[in-house]
Amino acid sequence: MTYVMLVGSDVALLEGLSQSLAGLGHRPSVCASIRDARDACVARPPLVLVVDRALASSAGAELLQLPVAAGGARILYRMASTPPLPLLPALQRVVLADLTLPLERHRLAALCQSVGERAKATGKAPRDTPEGLRAI
């Protein structure tokens, strides 16, 4: 199971994607803003971080500060009716894919699956340890 965080302002789209990813065995989480995502990422870094390109463009370097689990990936998305906004070169280098949703929702699911399998194969998959059993 891959922990996927979806960040964007289109709640209906993200909830639909969340349900689709959950149906495939992933553990999705939805955040409406970069600030909410930062708080959630600090508590538990996602293996896959999926962010609206408009938010990424306006957040700039702040998006680079969101922690991702070891072996994880950042993915950007935009709506088909929205032109792609410019990104910082540093952000362009760390993005695994730039998707047009909902058209490429199957590609998103495949990328989440691939990142999860790669993390398991390399030993970088996050382990779910119950709170009481964690070392200090």
Language model regions located:
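Two-component/phosphorelay signaling modules centered on CheY-like receiver
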Residues: 11-30
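Conserved Asp/Asn-Gly motif in the active-site loop of CheY-like receiver
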Residues: 31-35
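Conserved phosphotransfer microenvironments
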Residues: 38, 47-75, 79-87
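As written
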Residues: 90-99
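Conserved acidic carboxylate
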Residues: 7-8
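C-terminal output helix
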Residues: 99, 103-112
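Alpha2 helix of the CheY-like receiver
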Residues: 38-39, 109
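CheY-like receiver
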Residues: 119-136
